[in-house]
Amino acid sequence: MIHMDIVSLAWAALMVVFTFSLSLVVWGRSGL
């Protein structure tokens, strides 16, 4: 159970970082 929690937490963190970096790139391309 704890292993599953760690995996799900890692996936959530990965998605947050991915979306954050993606939005940052989009902002930079649009000309901040």
From Swiss-Prot:
GO terms for molecular function: electron transporter, transferring electrons within cytochrome b6/f complex of photosystem II activity. It is a single-pass membrane protein. InterPro entries: Cytochr_b6-f_cplx_su8_sf (IPR036143), Cytochrome_b6-f_cplx_su8 (IPR005497). GO terms for biological process: cytochrome complex assembly; photosynthesis. SUPFAM superfamilies: PetN subunit of the cytochrome b6f complex. Keywords: Chloroplast, Electron transport, Membrane, Photosynthesis, Plastid, Thylakoid, Transmembrane, Transmembrane helix, Transport. The chain crosses the membrane at residues 6-26. It comes from the Eukaryota. One of its GO terms (cellular component) is cytochrome b6f complex. It is found in: Plastid, Chloroplast thylakoid membrane. Belongs to the PetN family. The 4 large subunits of the cytochrome b6-f complex are cytochrome b6, subunit IV (17 kDa polypeptide, PetD), cytochrome f and the Rieske protein, while the 4 small subunits are PetG, PetL, PetM and PetN. The complex functions as a dimer. Component of the cytochrome b6-f complex, which mediates electron transfer between photosystem II (PSII) and photosystem I (PSI), cyclic electron flow around PSI, and state transitions. This is Cytochrome b6-f complex subunit 8. It comes from Illicium oligandrum (Star anise). The lineage of its organism: Eukaryota, Viridiplantae, Streptophyta, Embryophyta, Tracheophyta.
